[in-house]
Design a protein with these regions (language model features):
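Glycine-rich FAD cofactor-binding loop and adjacent beta-loop-alpha segment at the N-terminus
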Residues: 3-4, 8-72
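Active-site flanking residues adjacent to catalytic metal/cofactor-binding acidic residues
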Residues: 6, 29, 144, 268-269, ...
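C-terminal helical "tail/cap" subdomain of flavin- and related membrane-associated enzymes
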Residues: 294-370
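FAD/FMN-dependent oxidoreductases across multiple families
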Residues: 218-302
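Short gly/ser/thr-rich secondary-structure transition/capping motifs
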Residues: 123-129, 186, 245-254
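Conserved FAD-binding catalytic core of PHBH/FMO-like flavoproteins
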Residues: 54, 144-246
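Conserved N-terminal helical subregion
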Residues: 52-55, 62, 66-154, 160-170
């Protein structure tokens, strides 16, 4: 089967590998150079669902060397002054042997590993443009060109979209008073923020807050920004040095009504974009890839490939919709400071702190989706 993939970011490139291993001939269209693809300052939380996908494709053993595992995921509600912790014991038994609740990955390391893997696959042909000269040459076309997809605009695919009244600020910071194997997801009235380990004393701080306050904080000097971080980090954790200048980006939500259009299949952020809280974004995108490659391995569908886009769209709808609603609800939960919500929030934290069964269930949803 001849497949075209538009976009060779993390999702498009992984799709190319996955479909090539399923026996397809893949043309991978990308206007950016490999250097431009690699040089992005982003950090991701990798769950066991992504680990399983990477293992299946034979990428995990090489890639895992550059990942930072964490054994503790601390969830804190500042408004309640309550906390509970996800541990490796809360994972399904087969996943516990990896001794990690999850892993933190820097974009450049994942991208380099995946691009290196692609270079060794003969049935992937990289083409340095984002325009397909003749779409009739392909049985199916995968659009993985991101949330601002030109493909989606050209096909006029409808979607549900809104902008959060927030922006995200991220910075690499040296911290004191924190273990190198723990991560934090913190809920407060400004918006959720995360503290992710990058090895040793280096951490990535990712905070979402109102556009007005975020714009003000982005204009602070490094010393004043450190002072600001000291006011929002958990008690006992102190910022020492900012490694890179803080960066910011807007936060929006987008969900296609359908994940296909004719023989075009929408993958990753071309189909859905969610709030970064909980670190679900990349894992959700890679589960798209896994679902699609599983369909290509079904003999009946190989001979009826025109059915694949519709079946893919239906197959992914529950997981994507559920995670989208869950992350959006978590943002709204975090920012609600109305007294009527105090008791429900208190009960949620009390139950999660004391019920290992519920923690296992929630962590499984965060790890493997729906």
């Amino acid at each position: 089967m001849n497949i075209a993939i538009i976009g060779s970011g993390l999702t498009g490139s992984l799709a190319a590998i996955s479909l090539a291993k399923a026996g397809c001939r893949v043309d991978l269209y990308e206007r950016l150079s490999d250097e431009e693809l690699v040089n992005r300052d982003r950090t991701y939380a990798i769950t066991h669902s992504s680990r399983k996908i990477l293992e299946k494709l034979g990428i995990w053993s090489n890639l895992s060397k550059d990942l930072v595992p964490f054994q503790y995921l601390n969830v804190i509600d500042y408004e309640l002054n309550k906390k509970f912790v996800f541990l490796t014991n809360d994972l399904p038994i087969p996943d516990q042997k990896y001794s990690a609740v999850g892993w933190i990955a820097e974009h450049k390391f994942i991208m380099l590993s995946i691009l290196s893997f692609i270079s060794n696959l003969e049935n992937i042909n990289k083409i340095p443009t984002s325009v397909i000269p003749n779409t009739n040459n392909y049985d199916l076309i995968v659009a993985a060109d991101g949330s601002s997809s030109n493909t989606k605009k050209k096909l006029k695919t409808p979607s549900f979209h809104f902008k959060y009244d927030q922006m995200c600020i991220t910075a690499k910071v040296l911290l004191r008073g924190v273990k190198s194997n723990e991560a934090f997801e913190i809920l407060n009235s400004e918006g959720p923020f995360a503290v992710l380990p990058l090895g040793g004393d280096l951490f990535q701080v990712i905070c979402s807050q109102s556009i007005l306050k975020g714009t003000y904080n982005m204009n602070l000097s490094k010393s004043l920004f450190l002072d600001y971080l000291s006011t929002i980090l958990p008690y006992g954790i102190e910022p020492d040095t900012i490694i890179d200048a803080p960066e910011s980006f807007p936060i929006d939500f987008c969900l296609n009504y359908l994940f296909f259009s004719g023989k075009y299949i929408y993958l990753g952020e071309t189909a859905h974009k969610i709030h970064p809280v909980g670190g679900q974004g990349l894992n959700l995108c890679w589960r798209d890839v896994d679902c699609l490659s599983n369909l290509f391995s079904i003999p009946l569908l190989k001979n009826n490939h025109s059915l694949i886009p519709l079946i893919y769209s239906i197959s992914r709808s529950i997981d994507v919709l559920s995670i989208s609603i869950l992350t959006d609800s978590l943002v709204r939960y975090s920012r609600s400071n109305i007294s009527i919500f105090y008791l429900p929030r208190f009960l949620v934290f009390f139950i999660l702190k004391n019920s290992s069964l519920l923690r296992k269930y929630i962590l499984n949803l965060m790890t493997n989706g729906f």
